[in-house]
Amino acid sequence: MKQLKWTAWILAAALALGASGCSAQALDTIPLGPSEDTSAGAAPTPQQQLEDLGLSLEEASALWAQLPEPRRQALRNASQPPEWLSYLAFDFAWVDRLDRYEAYHQAQPQLTAEEVVVQVNIGLDTPPYENPEPVEEPDSLTALVNQYHILSEDYVPKLVYLEAAYTNQRDRLRPEAYRAFVRMADAAAQDGLRIYNASAYRSYSTQKWVYQRYVRREGAAAADTYSARPGYSEHQTGLALDINTASFSDHFEESEEYAWLVENAGRFGFILRFPEGKEHLTGYQFEPWHYRYVGVAAAQQCWEENWTLEEYIARQPAPGRD
């Protein structure tokens, strides 16, 4: 019976290898096959523990190759799968962030493993502005600019001026964002609503002036909840704009235009950038007027999944796992 079990497993492994094109040599590093101890209480093998995450043989092998030796040894010796293994069930979990996931989960035990991975990937286990990462591809439509990702002072995208019918001031956007905004504004007009730009591109120096004005008025702690520091503003990308207003006192969220945008912005490639209930992820208060162009595919996924841009980026496959 034991030989039959081994034979069946070998055939299954051979089929998996043939289908994936993975070489036997690539799998030498992961303990494969059923445990010699077939009793009900037998410790699961590393392969079994990884496959229990829903990974294929190829995916399990690739993940095993990324694990540092102490983590591998923990799997070899475990009578039960270690808790940190639950993070790796998600293809957006980074192996080199396992220590951070564990530490953050200890500090936030109420979170699920998925929430832990997403929030650490966003950077929430570290204070904002403390060690920002430079935005590597500032021209990307989904470039993440926030309290953890900074644009260089001299970054200026390609920009075009908005026609007077679509703005209340002389202003600029990236060409692709402007074209999409025109289509969206025209569609809203067909429904009897007017949406227009109130504030679009801001240079580094302009954002510096805006932020310092708020700091003088209310202090840095308060300003940081609704105004970006210079270099940390999406407005510098030329992909963000404030629609119809940029004031909390106007209560844009109560307008018909806001309701229309919530339902339709994604069709044109825009997302509500700082939604209500996601302040702990974005770092900013709810801003019903602030929209960001990310392209139709990303915008629709964010709308369908109720994700912020932070969550969208945090859920992209980790290196070696796509």
Model-assigned labels for residue ranges:
Residues 22-199, 204-322:
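Extracytoplasmic cell-surface/polysaccharide-interacting catalytic and binding patches
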Residues 2-25:
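Sec-dependent N-terminal signal peptides of Gram-positive bacterial secreted proteins and lipoproteins
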